[in-house]
């Protein structure tokens, strides 16, 4: 992706300046409102980097911010996708589908990465919870699902393509989109499609 490095630097600046006084989502919205240079696509990609970082809890403490952001993208995505240009061949060849393998890879390549801090409050968990699986779950972003209205499939495909939104067709009427996808202005919500989780679409 052409502007991947720029998005990474912007995310680093935003997170470094954030002091935690307000919820990050509101802080990010205010930041973008004050910086009109960011278009909708810019905001979406920068937001993805930021929220991937926060999914890693306290595990990145002591690591250079831009390197931590790259590691967060690696941990939170099953494949490089649009972020491939940020990584060297060694990381790309070791982009495992299994989250625990990605965690092990980062642990072996970033000295200060501490996977036990993905969820810093392990001591408060019930003894019946599998700690490793629970921590891994924080790195897994559920898809956003839409149900296409009858006869509206061409409209939806065209609208998604025009907006540059990647999707997976689960069926002719069910599409899976990246978590956090903004659908404002993408086709006609309710007329072309509705947002509905996958399990509900099966009933």
List PLM regions with ranges.
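Class I Rossmann-like S-adenosyl-L-methionine
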Residues: 1-184, 188
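Conserved SAM-binding loop and adjacent beta-strand
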Residues: 187-202
